């Protein structure tokens, strides 16, 4: 006898998802911090450490206050225990939490976020970055920012290890001095000549002063010549100047390469849960 025909299985067949390939253009330029010499590293660290110790800049944290807040949280969880609210007057010898000389702290910028904001507003004279920052992309944007604002900046090894314990912080990833600084004026003047220049291909080096040949205001004779010349002659002159400027510029364009990101096909991916299974 012939076998009975089998009924088709119920349920939908899951289709395999196609691999999503992300295409992007890579950056042909390699931007990195300029290297400091050993003598300059020791000089910068010693001058900063000595100045901070001399001024006495330090952040004081009240440990008793932290313990008290932790106890209050524990006691608030227990309703049976009564919390004694006896206000105690602080002793005169107890140090208040915060920065000791506030006016000195206002002259400095500490941390990557503060340094970034101050550079955007063009308020800094000098920027120092710790070399132990991981990943390096955290401070890589400061290279373009400092060069566009004509602010000398460099990467100093062991900056956080040497300066953070003196100030009373856990780490110092970036440090900057404001333009209105008075207490650190001599130190900034001594450090700036030791800072190497940064190299960004698409940004010109603005640390050099403007040349004498460039004139801000045209003379009366030049104005009369411009009025006498026709429109066609002016367009020719402008095109010639643009061509000369393009030849003088040292920046060269680099070819871009297409980068494709393909996900790992051997990775075991969990299938998405259906709405029916979630409702159950």
UniProtKB/Swiss-Prot annotation:
The modification Phosphoserine is found at residues 12, 221, 230. Its main location: nucleus. One of its GO terms (cellular component) is nucleolus. This is Ribonuclease P protein subunit p38. One of its GO terms (biological process) is tRNA 5'-leader removal. Residues 267-280 have a biased composition (Basic residues). PANTHER family: RIBONUCLEASE P PROTEIN SUBUNIT P38. Residues 214-226 have a biased composition (Acidic residues). Residues 202-227, 254-280 are annotated as: Disordered. It is found in: Nucleus, Nucleolus. Component of ribonuclease P, a ribonucleoprotein complex that generates mature tRNA molecules by cleaving their 5'-ends. Also a component of the MRP ribonuclease complex, which cleaves pre-rRNA sequences. Belongs to the eukaryotic ribosomal protein eL8 family. The gene is Rpp38. InterPro entries: Ribosomal_eL30-like_sf (IPR029064), Ribosomal_eL8/eL30/eS12/Gad45 (IPR004038), Rpp38 (IPR042848). One of its GO terms (molecular function) is ribonuclease P RNA binding. Component of nuclear RNase P and RNase MRP ribonucleoproteins. RNase P consists of a catalytic RNA moiety and about 10 protein subunits; POP1, POP4, POP5, POP7, RPP14, RPP21, RPP25, RPP30, RPP38 and RPP40. Within the RNase P complex, POP1, POP7 and RPP25 form the 'finger' subcomplex, POP5, RPP14, RPP40 and homodimeric RPP30 form the 'palm' subcomplex, and RPP21, POP4 and RPP38 form the 'wrist' subcomplex. All subunits of the RNase P complex interact with the catalytic RNA. Several subunits of RNase P are also part of the RNase MRP complex. Keywords: Acetylation, Nucleus, Phosphoprotein, rRNA processing, tRNA processing. The keyword Acetylation applies. The modification N-acetylalanine is found at residue 2. Signal peptide: none annotated. The keyword Signal does not apply.
């Amino acid at each position: 006898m012939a076998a009975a025909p089998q009924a088709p299985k119920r349920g939908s067949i899951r289709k395999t998802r196609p691999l999503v390939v992300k295409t992007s253009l890579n950056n042909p330029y390699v931007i990195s911090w300029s290297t400091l010499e050993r003598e300059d590293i020791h000089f910068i660290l010693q001058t900063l450490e000595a100045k901070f110790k001399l001024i006495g800049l330090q952040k004081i944290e009240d440990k008793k206050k932290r313990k008290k807040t932790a106890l209050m949280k524990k006691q608030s969880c227990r309703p049976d225990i009564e919390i004694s609210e006896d206000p105690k007057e602080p002793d005169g010898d107890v140090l208040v939490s915060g920065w000791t000389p506030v006016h000195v702290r206002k002259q400095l910028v500490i941390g990557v976020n503060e340094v970034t904001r101050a550079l955007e507003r063009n308020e800094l004279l000098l920027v120092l970055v710790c070399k132990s920052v991981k990943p390096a992309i955290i401070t890589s944007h400061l290279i373009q920012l400092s060069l566009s604002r004509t602010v000398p900046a460099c990467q100093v090894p062991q900056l956080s290890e040497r300066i953070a314990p003196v100030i009373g912080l856990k780490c110092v990833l970036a440090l900057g001095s404001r333009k209105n600084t008075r207490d650190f004026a001599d130190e900034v003047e001594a450090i700036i000549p030791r800072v190497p220049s940064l190299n960004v291909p698409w940004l010109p080096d603005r640390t050099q002063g403007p040349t004498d040949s460039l004139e801000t205001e045209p003379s009366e004779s030049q104005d009369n010549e411009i009025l006498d010349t026709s429109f066609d002659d002016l367009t020719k002159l402008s095109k010639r100047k643009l061509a000369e400027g393009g030849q003088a510029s040292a920046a060269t364009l680099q070819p871009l390469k297409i980068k494709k990101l393909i996900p790992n096909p051997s990775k075991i991916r969990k299938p998405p849960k259906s709405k029916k299974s979630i409702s159950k």
